[in-house]
């Protein structure tokens, strides 16, 4: 799991030790990269909201320099295009992948005065923060605004009400990474 190391740093480390990275695409000697289809996660989350009848779907985006975030946003935009809906840039708020960032992003959306009936958060942690912001403002989930995250963190099932999330095969990815290390 690479965190915020850039590709150059990973390739340099791999010169001394074969490594496996998950969650990114990287072509370098002695590096095995295992990537998930993040675009599909954003697409599925947005399609779900569209299937519920939502047409004004906000997006709490992840960091602009993070591949997972940009790919999930691309999936959000593709789902809107396929539904014949314009991308409402005023409904896209940049954030990080943290609860506090989701809370701040939702506050910006609510303060903007823009109407929306649903939110696609780039990950579950951002969605948790967004839910807290809505709760503090008296906005009821899902009665007033629906929200979908990505990752299927264990806490999603224990939120009130349980949060809809797109499952990422994290366990399976970790098994594949471990297997790649020993083969």
Language-model features: locations:
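Flexible loop/hinge segments that line or gate small-molecule binding clefts
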Residues: 2-44, 125, 151-163
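Hydrophobic alpha-helical segments within soluble ligand-binding/sensing domains
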Residues: 34-59, 74, 99-108, 127, ...
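Short acidic capping loops at alpha-helix termini that bridge into adjacent secondary structure
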Residues: 55-56, 87-91, 141-146
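Secondary-structure junction motif
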Residues: 59-78, 128
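Short beta-strand elements in bilobed, periplasmic/extracellular small-molecule ligand-binding domains
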Residues: 77-100
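Flexible loop/turn connectors
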Residues: 107-108, 112-183
């Amino acid at each position: 799991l690479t965190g915020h190391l850039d590709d150059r740093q990973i390739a340099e480390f791999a010169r001394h030790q074969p490594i496996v990275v998950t969650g990114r695409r990287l072509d370098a000697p002695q590096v095995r990269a295992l990537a998930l289809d993040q675009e599909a996660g954003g697409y599925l989350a947005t399609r779900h909201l569209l299937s519920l009848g939502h047409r004004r779907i906000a997006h709490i985006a992840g960091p602009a320099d993070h591949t997972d975030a940009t790919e999930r946003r691309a999936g959000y935009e593709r789902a809107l295009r396929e539904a014949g809906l314009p991308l409402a840039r005023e409904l896209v708020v940049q954030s990080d992948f943290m609860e506090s960032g989701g809370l701040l992003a939702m506050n910006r959306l609510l303060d903007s005065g823009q109407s929306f009936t649903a939110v696609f958060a780039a990950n579950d942690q951002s969605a948790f923060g967004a839910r807290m912001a809505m709760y503090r403002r008296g906005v009821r989930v899902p009665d007033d605004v629906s929200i979908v995250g990505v990752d299927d963190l264990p806490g999603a099932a224990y939120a009130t009400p349980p949060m809809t999330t797109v499952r990422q095969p994290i366990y399976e990815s970790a098994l594949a990474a471990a297997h790649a290390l020993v083969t």
